[in-house]
């Protein structure tokens, strides 16, 4: 690389994608700076998204577990916790994550520049520092990893004290008794679980005809049932006509003619790339209507020396994938090509209560493809470990080819689903005949474990063959 620039590469953003790119670059000997607009590294994932929402979910699920355990069935012992209490738990996790990630940059001698950056030309950034001063920095190459933020439609007043998005909900100052959640995607469903777990009434407004339609239908139906069973009111195929903030809450007028009122509204319908402040017009780069950039297989934009990773390029918009994208982009940036690539079957983890996780094809996809598959199931209620810990709700489903026994998809609903899925994923990734459902029959599992569900499901599926 040329050394006529201030840096070999500048990474804009310190979330998972930016961190992956920065660490990949410094490990290859590049002179790297990371620009972060906030005082702490970690990006939205650490401070407003993945980490705090999962910490909230964990605290609420433990309260539910305690209150439903027959050992503690005396009602005088029921646990109660305020939203402020569980937010404090989330804050402690955020602080630990921030300290750890700051250490990554320090140990690897990667410089952190704080401020808001925008492009002056194709190799120059203007950096507006927090004290109001403006500096310019240059680099041969760039990685845009500035993430995304909640989408704000113009006709919704997000300045109203009772109207929140998925970032500002973490600053909730009151204890709601009733919440409307608009948008039944992953974020909306996760927060529906959290609020209902705290005994808050929830109206979940879904603009589509079923929850999380990308999931295997049995998983989607299971979530719908558990929401119904816990008291969440789901309204499918609805869109808002008007959202009205009033003194004591929010009134939502739906296009179907219905009206809903609640203490507050969580608007969780879509996200927008954080590209509007980068002055991309100065370098001729264009985004789509949601502020996202198009990239090639090596994460290069229309300008070959500028790369983009993470939420700012859209699908799959997962923290796990963003980190890998950053590492791949770093390899391509230094070497001109990347030997690594994002895996074809990226696992999905949805942290509702209970969790949902999947990898590979759904039954609906395999049916449409006319693949001769069979299904093996294990119900958690039949597993000794689940009975011991009192988590009997859930199922593991394995889809496999009837003739070759190749595993085609795995779907899990229940506590620890996002962990359990990786056992099956590891087998699915095996080459040369290693991907076979018979592995689970011929392997000895620890007993009692949740992992034993794979053996039960494999036997169940193989017994269906004739």
UniProtKB/Swiss-Prot annotation:
* A single Gene Ontology CC term: cytosol
The EC class name is oxidoreductase
Q: Supply the NCBIfam families for this chain.
A: PRK05249.1 (NF003585)
Tell me what reaction this enzyme catalyses. NAD(+) + NADPH = NADH + NADP(+)
Q: Any binding details for the cofactor?
A: Binds 1 FAD per subunit.
Sorted alphabetically, which keywords does the UniProt record give? Cytoplasm, FAD, Flavoprotein, NAD, NADP, Oxidoreductase
Pfam families (UniProt xref): Pyr_redox_2, Pyr_redox_dim
The molecule here is called Soluble pyridine nucleotide transhydrogenase
| InterPro entries per record | Class-I_Pyr_Nuc-Dis_Oxidored, FAD/NAD-bd_sf, FAD/NAD-binding_dom, FAD/NAD-linked_Rdtase_dimer_sf, Pyr_nuc-diS_OxRdtase, Pyr_nucl-diS_OxRdtase_dimer, STH_gammaproteobact
Please name the source species. Answer: Klebsiella pneumoniae subsp. pneumoniae (strain ATCC 700721 / MGH 78578)
Location within or outside the cell: Cytoplasm
């Amino acid at each position: 690389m040329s050394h006529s620039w201030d840096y070999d590469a500048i990474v804009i953003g310190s979330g998972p994608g930016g961190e992956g790119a920065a660490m990949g670059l410094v490990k290859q000997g590049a002179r790297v700076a990371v620009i972060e607009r906030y005082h702490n590294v970690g990006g939205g994932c650490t401070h407003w998204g993945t980490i705090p929402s999962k910490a909230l979910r964990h605290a609420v699920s433990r309260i539910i577990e305690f209150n439903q355990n027959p050992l503690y069935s005396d009602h005088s012992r029921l646990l109660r916790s305020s939203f402020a209490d569980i937010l404090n738990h989330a804050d402690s996790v955020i602080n630990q994550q921030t300290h750890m990630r700051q250490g990554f940059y320090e140990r690897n001698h990667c410089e952190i520049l704080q401020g808001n950056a925008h492009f002056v030309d194709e190799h120059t950034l203007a950096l507006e520092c927090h004290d109001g001063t403006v500096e310019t920095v240059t680099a041969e190459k760039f990685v845009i990893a500035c993430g995304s933020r909640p989408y704000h439609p113009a006709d919704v007043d997000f300045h109203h004290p009772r109207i929140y998005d998925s970032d500002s909900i973490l600053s909730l100052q009151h204890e709601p008794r009733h919440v409307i959640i608009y948008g039944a995607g992953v974020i909306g469903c996760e927060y529906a679980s959290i609020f209902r777990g705290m005994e808050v009434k929830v109206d979940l407004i879904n603009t589509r005809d079923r929850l999380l339609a990308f999931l295997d239908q049995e998983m989607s139906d299971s979530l719908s049932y558990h929401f119904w069973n816990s008291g969440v009111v789901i309204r499918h195929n609805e869109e808002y006509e008007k959202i009205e903030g009033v003194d004591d809450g929010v009134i939502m007028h739906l296009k179907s003619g219905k009206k809903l009122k609640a203490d507050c509204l969580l608007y969780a319908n879509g996200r927008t790339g954080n590209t509007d402040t980068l002055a991309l017009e100065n370098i001729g780069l264009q985004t789509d209507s949601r502020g996202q950039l198009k990239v090639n297989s090596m994460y290069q934009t229309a300008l070959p020396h500028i790369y983009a990773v993470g939420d700012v390029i859209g699908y799959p918009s997962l923290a796990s994938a963003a980190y890998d994208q950053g590492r791949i982009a770093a390899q391509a940036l230094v070497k001109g090509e990347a030997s690594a690539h994002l895996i074809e079957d990226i696992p999905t983890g949805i942290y509702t209560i209970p969790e949902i996780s999947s990898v590979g094809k759904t039954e609906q996809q395999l049916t449409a493809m006319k693949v001769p598959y069979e299904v093996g199931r294990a119900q958690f209620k039949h597993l000794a470990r689940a009975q011991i810990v009192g988590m009997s709700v859930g199922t593991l489903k394995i889809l496999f080819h009837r003739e070759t026994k190749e595993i085609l998809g795995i779907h899990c609903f229940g506590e620890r689903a996002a962990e359990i899925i990786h056992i099956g994923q590891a087998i699915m990734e095996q080459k040369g005949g290693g991907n076979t459902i018979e592995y689970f029959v011929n392997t000895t599992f620890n007993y009692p474990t949740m992992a034993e569900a794979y053996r039960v499901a494999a036997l169940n599926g193989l017994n269906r063959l004739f």
